[in-house]
Amino acid sequence: MSRLNLSFASCDYDHMRDLVSGKVRPEGIDLTPLTFDEPHLIFHQATHFSDFDVCELSFGRYVSLVSTGDNDKIALPVFPSRVPRIGALFVRAGSKIKRPEDLAGARVGLPEWAI
């Protein structure tokens, strides 16, 4: 069976180095890793030019694409650190939000949002 050729863009994260260096090889895949200094550079190239087969993409960027009708990307919930990066929500002092249920129907801010 032939192997699948995939380009993969990531930043130089310690938890991705073995994959990027080739020390860890995905079964059945010939991976061409591309490393970037900043995630926003990956996000820009991936969304404007579709330069990569696989890459990280912020949740904010993905949601903004889908909200404009751009359904060309498929999001996979893969968390190499084994947890989502956004582990907390911050609420304004004096807010009526005291429990997660209080967020139903509320607006939330994201650290990265592209329109």
Sequence positions of predicted segments:
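Small-molecule-sensing regulatory modules
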Residues: 1-6
